[in-house]
A protein has these predicted regions:
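Metal-dependent phosphoester/phosphodiester hydrolase catalytic core
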Residues: 1-475
Length: 475
């Protein structure tokens, strides 16, 4: 039995716990017991067993555990889950209702290529950061597995292929230990399916023909929904949650992305219903917003090998218009509220700040990227710099943004080290929220050549160390 915590419930109400059992038979997990400071806590449970998927011979379900007497402060609870086969209970926080004197910490990570980290450096790093920071949750920002690399057995039916790749990752006890460190919010990016999804890729034979590409895409989506999406808040692929006064919105810019073809209409990276949810979220802000998106906002145009958000000019302009709406005060309380952007994808840990003339936004638009947790091979040899100046268009209006650049001062910060971010939110001055942003090395960058690898030169090793720290106060 595989057991992984999903997203916590808002207002400290409890948790979602994901289960997967081998075979086709129905099942229901044994009751969970919950304690706080070793005192038993009354709970209610709701079990949702997902429908069988043809050619997939595992059953998956989500157990919702609700505290009858929730503590809005988000303390640590001890959860005993019999199927997890642990000698000790899990120690998970509930989701705080608000940012208080103690603050709230969460982790951010993306891009885990297991083939280069089977020894578990990523797991050990997250375990160490969990001991240091006691995070309330973690945000996994995409590419939680690489379904497309290595290519694998191309003779397997699509569902069996994706199931086998998830079994390599979720079936790895070390990776499950990482997932079990704290409750988890998931969002997908391309490698849950294949590179630059939904585009045809020369190195992925399953994508060459339209009919097979459609079958493969549906299989990838079905397995993503079962292994990751079903453990999120509704509507599962994109969603929001709140830790008052901070509001989070998790954007899925991948699973419903249009193929990149400007005819007969411009392509989109978000469906209209997600746009409406995102715009409604901005208009309901009463404090800082945190926007998690699988690809960075400050990114140069990609090409046929890998498209960026900026390759979709209509949606890219609309995204920046949404951010401007918040900074201009088109919010629930009529005040301007800052947006912190979080992302992954680019195999560079990075912090950058964008600014637009005429906006009263002292902190600009800060963007923190945690990537990669484990670098794919062949991997990046140079850091991925942001687009330092770009113009977007929305409803006939052009706006130009500039990203702060001062190489002598290390601005923007960039690293190739395998990394994880920790973000701590606390009370700031004048009603603002202080965000302490840090990036941590979980494994050094491996710069060995193919020959050095072939001849057995050892991979670099190193401790968990802080690479970057920045404090900002957001309205």
């Amino acid at each position: 039995m595989w057991v992984v915590p999903g997203a916590p419930l808002e207002q400290g109400a409890g948790w979602r716990i994901w289960y997967s059992q081998d075979g086709d038979a129905d099942f229901r997990p044994q009751p969970v017991t919950v304690a706080k400071s070793q005192q038993p806590q009354p709970i209610d449970e709701e079990w949702n067993l997902l429908a069988r998927l043809p050619e997939f011979h595992r059953r998956i379900g989500v157990l919702t555990v609700r505290l009858r007497q929730p503590d809005p402060a988000g303390p640590v609870y001890e959860l005993s889950v019999p199927e997890a086969e642990r000698g000790a209970p899990f120690r998970w926080r509930s989701l705080p209702a608000g940012v208080g004197q103690e603050g709230v910490t969460f982790l951010l990570a993306s891009c885990f290529w297991r083939d280069d980290d089977k020894e578990g450096s990523y797991t050990a790093g997250v375990q160490e950061l969990t001991r240091r920071w006691s995070p309330a949750f973690k945000l996994l920002a995409g590419d939680q597995l690489y379904a497309d690399w290595p290519i694998g057995n191309t003779d397997l039916p699509a569902v069996e292929f994706y199931a086998s790749r998830y079994a390599e990752y979720w079936g790895d006890a070390l990776y499950r230990e990482l997932l079990q460190t704290s409750p988890t919010f998931f969002v997908c990016d391309d490698h849950e399916f294949w590179n630059d999804f939904p585009e045809r890729q020369i190195q992925v034979p399953r994508t060459w023909l339209p009919a097979e590409r459609k079958i493969t895409a549906q299989a990838g989506l079905d397995l993503y929904d079962r292994f990751q999406g079903c453990a999120n808040p509704a509507p599962f692929r994109w969603y929001g949650f709140r830790i008052d006064p901070v509001s989070f919105f998790v954007v899925d810019s991948r699973s419903r992305r249009d193929p990149f073809n400007k005819q007969p209409r411009p392509p989109h990276f978000l469906p209209e219903e997600q746009w409406q949810d995102l715009e409604r979220w901005v208009h309901q802000l009463t404090g800082p917003g945190v926007l998690l998106i699988g690809q960075p906002a400050f990114q140069k145009d990609g090409d046929w090998r890998d498209h960026s958000l900026s390759n979709f000019p209509e949606d890219y302009g609309r995204l920046w218009a949404v951010i401007e709406e918040s900074l201009e005060g088109h919010t629930a309380d009529g005040r301007p509220h800052d947006i912190l952007v979080l992302s992954g994808d680019i195999h560079t840990g990075r912090f950058a700040v964008g600014r637009r003339g005429g906006l009263d936004a002292p902190e600009g638009v800060p963007e923190l990227i945690a990537s990669p947790a484990s670098m794919i091979r062949p991997g990046s040899k140079e850091v991925e710099e942001p687009d330092y100046r770009f113009t977007v268009h929305h409803r006939g209006r052009a706006t130009t943004w500039q990203v702060d650049r001062n190489p002598a001062a290390g601005v923007p910060f960039m690293t190739l080290a395998n990394n994880v971010a920790a973000v701590r939110m606390g009370l700031g001055t004048n009603g603002r929220i202080r965000f302490e942003l840090t990036l941590w090395q979980v494994r050094p960058y491996d710069s060995r050549s193919w020959w050095e690898r072939f001849t057995g030169d050892p991979a670099p090793v190193g401790p968990v160390i802080e690479l970057f720290r920045k404090e900002i106060e957001l309205r």
